[in-house]
Amino acid sequence: MTSSVWQERRHGEDKQRRFDHRSPYQRDRARILHSAAFRRLQAKTQVLGVGMNDFYRTRLTHSLEVSQIGTGIAAQLRRKYPQHKQLLCSMSLLESLCLAHDIGHPPFGHGGEVALNYMMRDHGGFEGNGQTFRILSKLEPYTLDFGMNLCRRTMLGILKYPAPYSKLFVAGEHNEITNHRQLKPSQWPPVKGIFDDDNDIFAWVLEPLSEADRSRFTSTQEGSHPALHHYPHLRTQFKSFDCSIMELADDIAYAVHDLEDAIVMGIVTASQWHQDVAPTLTNSSDAWIKQELADIGNKLFSHEHHLRKDAIGTLVNGFVTAIVISEDDVFEEPLLRFNATLEPEFAIALNVLKQLVYKYVIRKPEIQMLEYKGQQIVMGLFEAFASDPERLLPLNTQVRWRESEQQGLNTHRILADYISGMTDEFAGRLYQQLFSPKAGSNVELSKEM
């Protein structure tokens, strides 16, 4: 592995700041942390809608927790595998990936994502991870045309689904929709991949790989996606070593910390835990899981906050310390050859917790109503802006739209960029501004975006 190749940036930088001793990955982390796109995560839905309660996680606090878990995983792997110290060369790199992993997700969570994907159905689709790649490499105004201009290895690590939309998309049968209110998310799952509009950047990221590695890394397969219950498209098969750590940290945070939110708010109960979780984990072949299960269950649903926090810490520690490094010797490049994976019994346990959150939290009618509302807001905004972009878009977005039109590029992508960058609250107020007769002046809104 030639580290200098992976530390390259698309746009060469000759900045020499006074007494700046930071590594390339420390600079990447700073750019992400100080970006407007990262700040907006504080007002974007994680699982529970923003404003429902002041306890639960937003996309921002979730990302901070993913970062902490990610560095914890790296520390454990460094201790277990000293022979792989070159792979685990930078905590700042992993922090960067974890902090940035949700930066492209639109307002209103999955509802907003499905809405944008539907509105972009004839224009290359929309998906949050693809938008993250686009923000980091093109949209965030740290540079004029190169986004945050991050290191190549950072960009490789953010690629959860390394294949373009056109390679993954499978046309499905859909009921004819005559009104946006009829849209069913199950019929319009976003393609998990990179937008074709960004293929040039994708090619640059993969440039150091051999032809064989590149071909295998971007290969696809049929089959349902593990994160989705209805997924007709092809799916990618591989991710880089750094990405595998980030994804595990994300899964642990989702399964454990979002479960904590649901327990505190009374959405998940002890009886549901004993019905859906305990039977599987009681039969686990792992001694630690069987030994800790009863104590964890009792503490999670205790009225003593410190006991619940102890159980949460025990769960996170259990998963983090059960992560190992696996090898796929078909790849030449070490960043692809090795991945972080969970031991099988802990992978089962993590999936059980994720299914618990999905069943009792995500599918809860009150949560689905909020998601549906967000879905309608996003589609309404998109339809309005698409009807007359040069009249309704903010001036700076109008400039981007006109440039895309003049160059024969995908102008609808500009609309998706603008709407996906909104917070839940801003999108809701803008919708009211456009469609409610009693809404006030647009002056205040224009100052925010």
Curated annotation (Swiss-Prot):
Keywords: Hydrolase. It comes from the Bacteria. Residues 59-255 form the HD domain. GO terms for molecular function: dGTPase activity. One of its GO terms (biological process) is dGTP catabolic process. Coiled coil: none annotated. Residues 7-25 have a biased composition (Basic and acidic residues). The keyword Nucleotidyltransferase does not apply. Belongs to the dGTPase family. Type 2 subfamily. This is Deoxyguanosinetriphosphate triphosphohydrolase-like protein.
